[in-house]
């Protein structure tokens, strides 16, 4: 019935208007108008070539991808056993593990980053403990370098990995594992031949979501990184706040959006299979 | 899987306890440190005091930022939940053209790096003199809170039987009436969660506020950010603990509602 259709669109219209007017259009306008400043298509093209040829910017793109990759792998290594335990736990144990993941997940990113600054700082807890036990004579540099960025970002993004993996692991039929065990397979074999293959799409979805969020990350690298850890998001912010170079910021935005949206499309293919798609 | 191998399961359990501890430890550290009595943050604190809380509550600038965040988050959560409820209902019930494309578009603000969203909104706001205008910042926050609302309400609306709506319509209820008298009451637990978590999303949002707040509407995260860039002052530990407490309160409310609802369902059947 046509009346029904119209009311569907009427219901969804406010949300669509909000997202188009305050999200899609501003992004398109910002990119378009900033590039238009350059004048002609040729000028944009040569600016794009010089931006991509610049050491600082190429360096930032490289750094961003390296950090995002290391963070993704770390989150996977820590998240996989955690998620496995969550998917097999019941009752109180399940609630306790879930609390340990959900409380940080919903806590402000600034607060979580600050927590790691308190722990890893020059006068931080780790250094205080190591100094007082006499294991070291002067404070270690655990922050304002890549190590600090990777620790902070892994902590912030870990819940996304665990919750995505959880969806895939919960869907595994435990009778399959019992059958393998009944036929004499050893635990490691069961894991490698049955459990891992069945959760691999979750691994892909979780890794992609963490990587996507990591390449666009701003807060943690800006607070915990050193001068050598400038990531793409930080660079965009600086081009605007410091240099007021809108065309370069627009070109960087295009690059960042291109990577993000391509990987998001890929993520959709894996996440839809696990059914528990929450982004 | 590990039934016959107690050592292996013991190792796994120890690992899980360790990892769970690691997840909570940073948050616990901040809360404990916020009560420290010394002149700077020491862990564990040598003496306990509430001095950093008093310093926070006695500082007009901190309090102003708390108030700004509260006002903005309140507007943003009401607006995004209202708009999101209508959209989530249409998405849950409708098989309309471009449904998947519409959903993907509405969830996009969650995926697109916040720096891009913030810069683009700043570009727009600066031209219309909207920087520092609180209702405008709330509207901007609604864009990133909307996906949170949609995800929560989608799963709630899925549990409501469409036959109840059909029954109401056959009995002569209008579509708007069905929405108000059938769907809205049944979706209430989900609506409360949506309000809570969109409030938190806006209250904790940093990047959009950083660009849009100006001096007039400095929010709490922006104030923390500005102070973190200069030095790690212990007042931030107290502010952070308040934010952590807020998160935990929201989660407890959400858990209580869900518990009440599942009890209701199990007794009514």
What is each of the regions a protein language model found here?
Chain A
Residues 9-10, 25, 166-181, 193, ...:
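C-terminal transmembrane helix and the adjacent membrane-cytosol boundary/short C-terminal tail
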Residues 26-30, 113, 161, 202-237:
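Non-cytoplasmic
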Residues 17-55, 59, 65, 119, ...:
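Short membrane-interfacial helix/loop motifs at transmembrane-helix boundaries
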Residues 55-88, 154:
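Transmembrane alpha-helix signature in integral membrane proteins
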């Amino acid at each position: 019935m046509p009346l029904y259709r119209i009311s569907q669109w009427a219901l969804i219209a406010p949300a669509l208007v909000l997202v188009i007017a305050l999200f899609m259009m501003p992004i398109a306008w910002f990119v378009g108008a900033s590039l238009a400043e350059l004048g002609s298509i040729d000028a944009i093209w040569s600016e794009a070539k010089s931006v991509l040829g610049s050491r600082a910017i190429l360096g930032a793109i490289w750094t961003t991808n390296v950090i995002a990759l290391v963070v993704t792998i770390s989150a996977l290594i820590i998240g996989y056993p955690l998620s496995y335990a969550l998917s097999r736990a019941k009752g109180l144990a399940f609630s306790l593990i879930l609390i340990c993941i959900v409380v940080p997940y919903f806590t402000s990113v600034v607060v979580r980053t600050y927590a790691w600054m308190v722990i890893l700082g020059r006068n931080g807890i780790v250094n205080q403990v190591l100094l007082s036990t006499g294991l070291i004579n002067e404070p270690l540099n655990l922050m304002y370098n890549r190590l600090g960025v990777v620790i902070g970002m892994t902590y912030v993004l870990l819940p996304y990995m665990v919750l995505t993996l959880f969806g895939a692991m919960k869907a595994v039929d435990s009778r399959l594992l019992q059958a393998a065990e009944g036929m004499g397979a050893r635990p490691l074999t069961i894991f490698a031949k049955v459990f891992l293959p069945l959760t691999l799409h979750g691994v892909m979805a979780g890794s992609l979501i963490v990587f996507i969020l990591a390449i666009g990350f701003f807060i943690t690298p800006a607070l915990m990184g050193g001068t050598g850890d400038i990531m793409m998001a930080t660079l965009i912010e600086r081009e605007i706040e410091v240099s007021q170079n809108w065309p370069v910021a627009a070109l960087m935005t295009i690059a960042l959006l291109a990577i993000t949206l391509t990987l998001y499309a890929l993520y959709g293919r894996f996440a839809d299979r696990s059914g528990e798609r929450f982004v | 899987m590990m039934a016959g191998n107690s050592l292996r399961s013991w190792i796994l359990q120890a690992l899980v306890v360790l990892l769970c501890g690691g997840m909570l430890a940073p948050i616990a550290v901040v809360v404990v440190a916020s009560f420290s009595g010394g002149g700077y943050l020491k862990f564990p604190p040598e003496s306990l005091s509430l001095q950093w809380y008093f310093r926070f509550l006695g500082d007009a600038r901190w309090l102003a930022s708390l108030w700004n965040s509260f006002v903005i988050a309140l507007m943003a959560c009401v607006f995004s939940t209202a708009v999101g409820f209508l959209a989530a209902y249409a998405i849950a019930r409708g098989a309309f053209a471009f449904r998947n494309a519409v959903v993907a578009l509405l969830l996009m603000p969650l995926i697109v790096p916040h720096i891009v969203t913030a810069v683009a909104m700043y570009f727009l706001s600066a031209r219309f003199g909207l920087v520092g205008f609180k209702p405008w910042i709330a509207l901007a926050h609604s864009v990133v809170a909307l996906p949170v609302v949609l995800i929560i309400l989608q799963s709630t609306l899925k549990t409501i039987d469409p036959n109840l709506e059909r029954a109401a319509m056959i009995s002569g209820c209008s579509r708007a009436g069905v929405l108000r008298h059938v769907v809205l009451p049944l979706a209430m637990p989900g609506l409360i969660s949506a309000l809570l978590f969109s409030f938190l999303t806006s209250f904790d949002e940093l990047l959009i506020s950083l660009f849009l707040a100006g001096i007039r509407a400095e929010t709490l995260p922006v104030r923390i950010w500005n102070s973190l860039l200069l030095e790690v002052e212990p007042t931030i530990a107290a502010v952070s603990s308040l934010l952590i407490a807020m998160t935990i309160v929201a989660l407890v409310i959400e858990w209580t509602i869900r518990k009440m609802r599942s009890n209701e369902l199990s007794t009514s059947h």
